[in-house]
Amino acid sequence: MTNFERVKKFMETFGQEIKEKAEFPSDKIASLRHDLINEELDELKEAMNNKDIKEVADALTDILYVTYGAGHAFGINLDKCFKEVQNSNMSKLGLDGKPIYNEKGKVMKGPNYFKPNLDKFVV
């Protein structure tokens, strides 16, 4: 069972709306999902500012949890989307098979990069 599936079980148990196809939920649910993600991001910022690694772990896990919940609320299978994005990200290597970084250390797109095709999961 994936973490995305575990969150679905939680949502089913607690009577939360789950969409089976990609579509917007009600404004109330969309707003709730937005607020939950922002709340966890704020907790992450605070934990990082306090250099509290335990709270960083908690906030990062909660961000995943509420993001997976948002995926279910919008009917978007994040397991499938993640796999597609992972494949796209791995295409960023340079011609020599090595990563390309900018001055800040961000991985840049190599010449064989391809954009993830998420249409198949939301259309």
Question: Can you annotate each of these PLM segments?
Answer:
Residues M1-V123:
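Flexible "arm" and connector segments at domain edges
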